[in-house]
């Protein structure tokens, strides 16, 4: 199936759903060679992935994932996993926003990995903050129940990705797997804040999310940043069931003066972790403001706020009341099995 799919993609043709699924099945089971995988991913990138292809790939990956079964609880499960690859070198904004949103009462099931192309992935910074990435299923359940947030480490929940690692590293370009990460949450998150670095993905992903059954999502692209930006305008596509809304957000709408992207730089993992600690300890400035705005979106998607303005207020309260800092400490201790 992989050879037939490769030939079709090289010819510039989109794959039928069944053929796309068959190709991904070959990859996930180790039936495809590194040469075939590398060629297939490169050809797909050159052709441009179609929504039907991406949805089929994601469905197969979900089947091969180690699922996280959520026990009880009320409200939506929200993920703040972006595609990464924006090369902006910012601190890990989505992780800070996830912790703040959890402190505001949103149930966060953050799916992520170590950095592939940026300086610091969500797994890297959480580990630096003290979170145990090698959690047992019981520890994962405990972190969600007690902290309101769990980190689902991609390396644990997607063991079949080992078949792709070598080819991805060798070709060294963004591939469809950068897109698939946020679409394959092991908990089946029903709401997502999904950051993308390329405006073209704003058109690709809405029908994919609808096909996969996501209830509510915001796909955001902040001038090449895969977050809601405070440096420039952010293009947003909001998916609510069958409805798709497109609009632009600016920092000025929320009373935030535009910042220079340099003010959001994270450097290495130690610096990024220190910035997040500072935000949770109540430090002001550009890093706090962009965290508030992205946390606001997660709070809105989680159904705790009627709009982003209310979300910003709730995010600020989460930090200023100390709830967000307590959330991080609870996440750390429960991930280690200490409570």
UniProtKB/Swiss-Prot annotation:
GO molecular function, one term: magnesium ion binding
The keyword Membrane belongs to this UniProt entry's keyword annotation: no
Residues bound to 5-phospho-alpha-D-ribose 1-diphosphate: 82, 85-86, 90, 92-95, 110-118, 122
GO biological process, one term: L-tryptophan biosynthetic process
Co-factor(s): Mg(2+)
CC per GO annotation: cytosol
InterPro entries: Anthranilate_Pribosyl_Tfrase, Glycosyl_Trfase_fam3, Glycosyl_Trfase_fam3_N_dom, Glycosyl_Trfase_fam3_N_dom_sf, Nuc_phospho_transferase
Cofactor, free-text remark: Binds 2 magnesium ions per monomer.
Gene3D superfamilies registered for this protein in UniProt: Nucleoside phosphorylase/phosphoribosyltransferase catalytic domain, Transferase, Pyrimidine Nucleoside Phosphorylase, Chain C
Residues reported to bind anthranilate 1: 82, 113
Assembly notes: Homodimer.
NCBIfam families linked: trpD
Matching PANTHER family: ANTHRANILATE PHOSPHORIBOSYLTRANSFERASE
The protein's name: Anthranilate phosphoribosyltransferase
Gene assigned in the entry: trpD
